[in-house]
Amino acid sequence: MKKTITHTLLLFPILAMGIQAQEKQSSPNLIFIMADQWRGDALGCLGKEAVKTPHLDQLASEGVNFTNAVSSYPVSSPARGMLMTGMYPVHSKVTGNCNSATAPYGVELPESARCWSDVLKDQGYELGYIGKWHLDSPYQPYIETSNNKGKIAWNEWCPKERRHGFSHWIAYGTYDYHLKPMYWDTDASRDEFYFVDQWGPEYETDRAIDYIANRDNKLRDAGKPFALVVSMNPPHTGYELVPDKYKEIYRDVDVETVCNSPIIAPKGTKMGDFYRKSVLDYYACMTGVDEQVGRIIRQLKEQGLFENTIVGFTSDHGDSMGMHEHIGKNIYYEEAMRIPMMISWPEKIAPRRDSTLMIAFADLYPSLLSLMGFKEQIPAEVQTFDLSASILSLE
């Protein structure tokens, strides 16, 4: 009898560990897909621009599509800093783009910041980051990439201690040569970057699919939930650096039919000609990114993970592209500030909902953590808003 009791007592910790593992596995996975410089109106399902995005249209129909989402500071690094910290730039310390001009002022994501990824790491999540990071400032001697050879250096490696819980890492700082992108892998040192003869979003999706499928059972612990960020650079400039198969989709579009707006300057003007030269390639980039989103979702379904995975798609900011006589972002017109934002979670989020709620890019920090069951773990210093109830259609 004593022996039986002893054996039973010894089993209790093992059983408890098993139950705990099951509880962790029941937590939702997260796939967060982010583009760069994608205007909020540029989705096929909205019918406002001549862009084709069938996979994103489908994703929008499977969850909630926020049609008034905004980037509070429509510049890459500050927006990304707000997303990661849930704090506005004066508190996140990312007050401008991370480059050699801002580096002397300490403009980069602090190692001490408590990011949403740090919270998930502490809750037992496996974390992966693939693509553009742009939250570390370059330091001398600058790495040998072409965008570090001008007056301002842009590109920098992110060492492990600054990755905020992401243990699987295939990323770069900022590098806009989309047809021959460069990366550092997880264990690479600063000088061990490599270039790929493949369109960036396609390569990043290949690697994301490997992570989701957990190729060779080596990329993550299959017994734990995971969160994966796929940060694609297009449709950021250069717009023209996109595979021909996507350009071909827009070959027969009369560009003047997409320039019928009073905020687009006339043909023959500097800004008007820039828009006409760029817009169809911009759409081609979006259609290409859309195809990669479809591949990621297909892999989730093939692995039986889709139902309990939160899938989010958004952008750090929009793009003026010559509208309002302005090229680029960093301007408070809708074309620069408004962004796409959609969230799907088949187990919890009702489908086919368009929401006019004005949600900010940075609100995703507390909203996603709360949605995933970690409301109590949101740091007190987070300044943005938990809108998870609106995502779940509870208010």
For each predicted feature, which ranges?
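Formylglycine-dependent sulfatase
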Residues: 2, 19-395
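Bacterial N-terminal signal peptides
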Residues: 7-16
